[in-house]
Amino acid sequence: MAEAVAYLNNRRVSVAWNGERLVTGRADGPLEFDGEGSLLVWDLRGILKNRPAPGPLPLNPKRETLVDSGMAWGEDVIDAIMADRGTVIVPLRSLRGWGELDEALVYAELELVSLDWVGEPVAAHADFQGDIVELLRQLLRRNIPRVMVNSLDGSFPFIPAGLAGSVRLDVAMLTDGHPPNWAGEVFRLG
């Protein structure tokens, strides 16, 4: 299991799904990224505002760091990249449809897109709601090699084996449980 942290105002915080939206809990302590292996970082200030709020992170250059800063517009990917805080995750949760994802692809060759899951995709735009298989196919058509499925309630989508072998599927979990067999790297937030 890989390490994952959520932070708000330079403090580690707990995060949970209340059935409608992400909510933050107590501030646990200062933000430190010591250790080894991959690290998933949820910048809750950016996620809650739907716009990257770039600021310095005390990153460890020896670790692969994946950063979800939140964004609603394709051009927001520029701010996230320029912050140079690790691999940029483009979240579909608040992006304004395929057009905005395509705009982000104009600015950068994206390595990683995330999809929030609560028995079905959770997204503000109808383009990203519905059949998970079709969503993954659309991402493959756009040459996106890696997708992070954020399981907000402990449930996971059914991914056919043929499709699971075509794209790297990682998982971020907010609750305890066992990841699906198609999961690549598994991160636990909490």
How would you name each of these model-derived features?
Residues 76-101, 148-154, 167-190:
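Glycine-rich phosphate-binding active-site loops on the catalytic face of alpha/beta enzymes
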Residues 53, 101-102:
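Short amphipathic alpha-helical segments
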Residues 1-63, 72-82, 109-113, 119-148, ...:
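Conserved N-terminal beta1-alpha1 strand-loop-helix module at the mouth
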Residues 105-107:
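Short, conserved loop/helix-junction motifs that constitute active-site signature segments
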Residues 5-7, 42, 66-70, 91, ...:
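A cross-family glycoside hydrolase active-site/sugar-binding cleft signature
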